[in-house]
């Protein structure tokens, strides 16, 4: 390992590694979302069929995501992350295999496995992002999400290029899964998780359960959770349906549909990279209000337009508006060091639920209202809810404890295997 890297402070190494993990996770997710039209055609799925399969496949992931905070408390971020990396790799490869075999049953099973693995990864990644921000004493959470967005752009381009070159879905998925899975485990061994106190799991698990569950009764946490849910639903709906909506709505090619998704993610990336300056200037509340207005305007332009050019402008506004919503929710949830881990876990859990419900929800609406382009307009509703609760992301006025003390509330990593 590079000596200069090893010479960095522990939390700085963790920051760089987590940026990398977010980035490759974006590549993995979006390299297959760009191939949804091919998967749909190979499995002969209608929008309703695809939505139903994704809904059934989300059940295991939903159970897992709500169990993740307790799993983190018992086993620590490192062990949960490692398990998620292995399960996610297996599920991703199986999605490609099920598509190649033309089996809806195998494809559905693969979605379940992939979702479970993704849930086991999502919560520890977001919890660690909050711990790292607290340790640095400055805003860094948007940078992790910017890395995911940058990886997503690369994944969209990869998927579009693979489609244009006629690369089989199964081959693309196998290569991406193995490379990303290996890099995740390598990052874990290199110091992805900041050391902390012993996991509660080395004692009775019930010791931590009240703290984990009590945040669900906190009014501010619930309202911030509404924002996290709205932001993730907006992003998840675009991820799953935008390329297909453009293909069906404007008779474009799959490759161009993948590039449209790349525009959405590319705009998100730019805003997330430079968004910290906007937050400093406008404040959290002003930044969130502007973000929600832009997202709603862009979504309306895309969903109601008959012009592909205007729709593309709408996609850019939608992506730029969505960009900072979830990072702001995570930052607000971690304002108070005591219990920050539980609140961030709550945000990640709600976001995962939103992402997993977005696909089937849009599929059902698309079947009833003439296709995914118009169905995506339903996302305006949660974005309006996010706009209404924007005032609750304002920083707490109470003094914040030493950031390093926050680490005492987090589980100890288990050595990577």
Where are these regions (language model features)?
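Hydrophobic core of transmembrane alpha-helices in multi-pass small-molecule transporters
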Residues: 23, 103-121, 311-323
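Helix-to-loop junctions at the C-terminal end of transmembrane segments
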Residues: 64-77, 163, 271-284, 366-367
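C-terminal ends and interior cores of transmembrane alpha-helices
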Residues: 86-101, 294-306
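Intracellular juxtamembrane helix-capping segments at the cytosolic ends
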Residues: 119-134, 323-337
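C-terminal transmembrane helical hairpin of 12-TM major facilitator-type secondary transporters
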Residues: 282-329
């Amino acid at each position: 390992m590079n000596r200069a890297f090893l010479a960095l402070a522990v939390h700085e190494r963790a920051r760089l590694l987590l940026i990398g993990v977010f980035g490759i996770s974006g590549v993995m997710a979006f390299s297959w979302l760009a191939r949804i039209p091919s998967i749909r055609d190979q499995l002969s799925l209608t929008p309703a069929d695809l939505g139903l399969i994704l809904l059934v496949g989300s059940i295991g992931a939903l159970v897992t995501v709500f169990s993740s905070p307790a799993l983190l408390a018992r086993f620590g971020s490192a062990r949960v992350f490692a398990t998620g990396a292995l399960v996610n790799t297996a599920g991703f490869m199986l999605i490609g295999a099920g598509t190649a075999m033309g089996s809806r049953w195998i494809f559905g099973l693969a979605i379940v496995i992939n979702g479970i693995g993704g849930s086991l990864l999502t919560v520890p990644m977001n919890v660690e992002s909050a711990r790292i921000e607290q340790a640095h004493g400055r805003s860094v959470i948007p940078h992790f999400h910017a890395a995911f967005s940058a990886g997503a752009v690369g994944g969209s381009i990869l998927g579009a290029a693979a489609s244009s070159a006629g690369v089989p879905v199964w081959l693309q998925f196998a290569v991406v899964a193995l490379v990303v899975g290996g890099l995740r485990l390598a990052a874990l061994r290199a110091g992805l998780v900041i050391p902390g106190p012993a996991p509660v799991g080395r004692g009775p698990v019930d010791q931590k359960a009240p703290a984990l569950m009590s945040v669900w009764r906190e009014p501010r946490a619930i309202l911030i959770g509404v924002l996290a849910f709205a932001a993730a639903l907006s992003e998840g709906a675009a991820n799953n349906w935008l390329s297909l909506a453009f293909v069906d709505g404007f008779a474009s090619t799959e490759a161009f549909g993948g590039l449209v998704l790349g525009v959405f993610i590319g705009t998100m990336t730019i805003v997330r990279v430079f968004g910290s300056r906007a937050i400093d200037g406008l404040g959290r509340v002003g930044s969130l209000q502007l973000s929600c207005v832009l997202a709603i305007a862009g979504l309306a332009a895309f969903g109601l337009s008959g012009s592909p050019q205007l729709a593309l402008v709408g996609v850019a506004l939608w992506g730029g508006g969505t960009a900072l919503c979830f990072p702001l929710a995570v930052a607000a949830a971690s304002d108070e060091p005591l219990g920050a881990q539980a609140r961030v876990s709550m945000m990640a859990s709600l976001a995962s639920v939103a992402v997993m419900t977005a696909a089937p929800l849009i599929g059902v609406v698309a079947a009833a209202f003439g296709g995914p382009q118009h169905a995506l307009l339903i996302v305006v509703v949660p974005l309006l809810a996010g706009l209404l609760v924007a005032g609750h992301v304002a920083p707490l006025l109470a003094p914040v404890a030493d950031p390093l003390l926050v680490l005492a509330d987090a589980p100890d990593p288990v050595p990577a295997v």
